[in-house]
Amino acid sequence: MKPRYRLAVERDAEQLLELTLRAYEPIRKLGIRFAAAHADLDLVLKNIRENACYVMEEDGRIIATITLRMPWGKQPGPYGVPHIWWFAVDPDTGKKGIGTKLLQWLEETILRDTLKVPFVSLGTADKHPWLIEMYERKGYVRSGEQDLGKGHITVYMKKQLRHDL
């Protein structure tokens, strides 16, 4: 069945929390303090209400999620463009490229073609053993670092989406 992409709604919160906590278990084991890794239902609801939280469904079940924090929102990214965060894939789906498909859909359909943004940003932890390299393989480049007081250095990354702006 073809995956379905849509904005999350409040009734998705419990399913998103369960998926997020399972997906971020390795992050917790590494001691990295990403907000999503320690989410509760209130934080999931806040994310849905304040940001553009997207889900990917298969057979009516949420299998992945990704969120955009907008420059005009309460927690903007560093560059005045939408900022990716809270990216999680159901670990039970196996290595099927689901995260890649969701990220590509977000970059192309939402960011490039709908919002017409020239680039997008994200942040990850310098201590994470493979996320920086994964994003570099997907076309992201390092663009800065900042100590946000979370016990790691946040590495900011950008990806150019449009060259005509």
UniProtKB/Swiss-Prot annotation:
One of its GO terms (biological process) is cysteine biosynthetic process. GO terms for molecular function: acyltransferase activity, transferring groups other than amino-acyl groups. The keyword Metal-binding does not apply. Disruption phenotype: Cells lacking this gene almost lose the ability to grow on 2SC as the sulfur source but are still able to grow on sulfate. Moreover, in contrast to wild type, they highly accumulate 2SC when grown on fumarate as the sulfur source. Addition of 2SC causes growth inhibition of the deletion mutant but not the wild type grown on sulfate as the sulfur source. Its EC number is 2.3.1.-. Pathway: Amino-acid biosynthesis; L-cysteine biosynthesis. SUPFAM superfamilies: Acyl-CoA N-acyltransferases (Nat). It comes from the Bacteria. It catalyses: S-(2-succino)-L-cysteine + acetyl-CoA = N-acetyl-S-(2-succino)-L-cysteine + CoA + H(+). CDD domains: NAT_SF. Keywords: Acyltransferase, Amino-acid biosynthesis, Cysteine biosynthesis, Transferase. Residues 3-162 form the N-acetyltransferase domain. It is an enzyme of class 2 (transferase). InterPro entries: Acyl_CoA_acyltransferase, GNAT_dom. Fumarate mediated succination of thiols increases in certain tumors and in response to glucotoxicity associated with diabetes. Therefore, S-(2-succino)-adducts such as S-(2-succino)cysteine (2SC) are considered oncometabolites and biomarkers for human disease. The demonstration of a metabolic disposal route for a S-(2-succino)-compound paves the way toward the identification of corresponding pathways in other species. PANTHER family: PEPTIDYL-LYSINE N-ACETYLTRANSFERASE YJAB. Catalyzes the N-acetylation of S-(2-succino)cysteine. Is involved in a S-(2-succino)cysteine (2SC) degradation pathway that allows B.subtilis to grow on 2SC as a sole sulfur source, via its metabolization to cysteine. Moreover, 2SC is a toxic compound in B.subtilis at high exogenous concentrations, and this enzyme relieves 2SC toxicity via N-acetylation. Belongs to the acetyltransferase family. This is S-(2-succino)cysteine N-acetyltransferase. It comes from Bacillus subtilis (strain 168).
